[in-house]
């Protein structure tokens, strides 16, 4: 039986085929070269984390396979500005439409409205998606180790690096962490959500954190819903956090809650 991740990767293959048919590689490379300059994603995180505050990557998504509808009518720019006002280091913007309700149009609109770095959050399976991401202004891309093999992970990483982008490498278990650490990116995410079973456990970050050396930057992802979650994960060394669903639901107090999480200790 196929998992949620399997089904996503299946339609990503269709999307990549359509992209290659619709736009030539040369066209995308020219657009990437003409895009606005890269904003340093990792350096923005470090500027806050090195001061012993919590560097937050605040996420925008209208829905998800695990939560269903989160905020289907959301104005992405309004949410992004709330995050920026609250002190977010960076943004994560879902560009997957079928499962998360996002788009590259959302990404571009948000990019024009904020000054902080942005991650294109999607399921990358081909270098052409990386080039497309830079063409739309992305500063960082995501590599999900559970979705691809080591050869492809290396190709995606190298493509992003050539374009000057940062790379967030996402893991969920020990085997994926070992594979991720073979890549040179310092940004190592631990997703507390199992993308195959769609269950969440903060203990995942606690278990995997000791595998990272001091030259890597641990980013705890998923399941962070209050200051207590952050305080718990700070005990294993995390100062960088990706938070989405809970913040999306905070309404008029969203900026205030970002500040509260940033200062939690």
Curated annotation (Swiss-Prot):
Enzyme Commission (EC) number: 4.1.1.48
One example GO MF annotation: indole-3-glycerol-phosphate synthase activity
Catalytic activity: 1-(2-carboxyphenylamino)-1-deoxy-D-ribulose 5-phosphate + H(+) = (1S,2R)-1-C-(indol-3-yl)glycerol 3-phosphate + CO2 + H2O
Pathway: Amino-acid biosynthesis; L-tryptophan biosynthesis; L-tryptophan from chorismate: step 4/5
Domain of life according to the entry: Bacteria
Listed name of the protein: Indole-3-glycerol phosphate synthase
PANTHER family assigned to the protein according to its UniProt record, in alphabetical order: INDOLE-3-GLYCEROL-PHOSPHATE SYNTHASE, TRYPTOPHAN BIOSYNTHESIS PROTEIN
Keywords (A to Z) from UniProt: Amino-acid biosynthesis, Aromatic amino acid biosynthesis, Decarboxylase, Lyase, Tryptophan biosynthesis
GO biological process: L-tryptophan biosynthetic process
InterPro entries the UniProt entry points to: Aldolase_TIM, Indole-3-glycerol_P_synth, Indole-3-glycerol_P_synth_dom, Indole-3-GlycerolPSynthase_CS, RibuloseP-bd_barrel
Protein family (similarity comment): Belongs to the TrpC family.
EC category: lyase
PROSITE patterns noted in UniProt: IGPS
Pfam families: IGPS (PF00218)
